[in-house]
Structures are given as C-alpha cells and as structure tokens.
C-alpha cells in the first residue's frame, strides 16, 4: 500500500514531470493558451502513458535489452496513433486545435522516460498506475497554466469546452470579465514562460513551507514531555 501511495505522490507532486523534471515543455508552452486545449492534450498524454506503461511492462520479459528503445517507440507510436484517431473521430474541433502536438506525443520525453525508468522494471498494475499518476500530474500543471493564460488573456474560462466534451459543455463557459481585445502577452509564448516560472516559484515555496513544518514537528516530538522549544 505504501508503494502505491508513493507512486501516486511522486507522479502528482514530488516528481511532477512539468514542474520538477521540466519535461515536455514544448507542448506545455505551446498548447496551454486555453484551459480546454490544456485539458485535452493532458488527458491524451495520460491515456498514452497509462497504456504504454501497461504494454511495455507486460512485454518486458520478452523484450531484448539491445533493441528495447526501438520497441518502446513502436509501442508508443501505435498507442498515439489510436488516441489520435479517437480524438479525430469524437472531438474533431479539439483535434484541429491541438494539431501536430498530438502525434508529437510519440517523441515526448515523459513517455519514453517512464517506459525506460519504471515500466521496464515493475509489474503491469504498478506501471499503469505510474503512467496514470505522471500523466495526471502533467495534466494538472497544463490545466492550471492554461486556465491562468485564458483568464488573463481573454477574461474567460472553459471557452470552447464543447470541442472536448460535446455540445452540452457550452454551459461551462464562464466570462470572468469582458474585454474587447485579448491581452496578447498572456496568449503568446512569452506569457506561457512567465506563467510557468510563477508556477515553479509557487511549488518551491509550498515545498519549503511543508519541509519547515515537518522539521518543526520532528523537533517537537524529540523534546522531553513538558518542555517547549522556546527559551
């Protein structure tokens, strides 16, 4: 149970692919102009990670070490092609919006990295959980960045959600403030870099505060009964 918890915590927070490893920055910065685009690519990446980790882990005993990387790439490319066709069939608007970044998941360092570092060494169930956790960690980072950029740039949230979730999702669109022209700095790549930098700083501050609290709690437990840390 502790190993399962550790895999989840590592994927979502401690070893977050976007905020700690800084992998997959090209789609992270390019696609997150809206919350819908960010969520769509994040979920597609999560599905690819989960399925490829599961497949590679299942076949790990029959995969020759000398040619494992080409085999991994073939498996990843097959899964990405299937996911791309699903998005094309059921979310064509999102497919057009994401464009080349869907097939580029094949070359995403996150996917290949987890295949080599985790799936090739662990069992199928734990590998699938690792892929799902890593994918959801990246999705959360993309969604937060996309939401911030969309709110600051257009004053809206979930604009175009119907492209991802269907026509009913039009009701999810929220206009936070009205603007006649978008704030281009937030919508263009410089805004993505600034937003990512602020998110990295925020995660660092949260980690430092949590580390300080753990140190204080450990110090209090180490004191004899009835004593305090104050002089």
Swiss-Prot record:
It holds the Pfam family Rnf-Nqr. The chain crosses the membrane at residues 18-38, 39-59, 63-83, 86-106, 125-145, 182-202. Its main location: membrane. Keywords: Cell inner membrane, Cell membrane, Electron transport, Membrane, Translocase, Transmembrane, Transmembrane helix, Transport. GO terms for cellular component: plasma membrane. The keyword Transmembrane applies. GO terms for biological process: electron transport chain. It is found in: Cell inner membrane. The keyword Transmembrane applies. It is a multi-pass membrane protein. Signal peptide: none annotated. Its EC number is 7.-.-.-. InterPro entries: NqrDE/RnfAE, RnfE. The complex is composed of six subunits: RsxA, RsxB, RsxC, RsxD, RsxE and RsxG. Part of a membrane-bound complex that couples electron transfer with translocation of ions across the membrane. Required to maintain the reduced state of SoxR. PANTHER family: ELECTRON TRANSPORT COMPLEX PROTEIN RNFE, ION-TRANSLOCATING OXIDOREDUCTASE COMPLEX SUBUNIT E. Belongs to the NqrDE/RnfAE family. This is Ion-translocating oxidoreductase complex subunit E. It comes from Escherichia coli (strain SE11). The gene is rsxE.
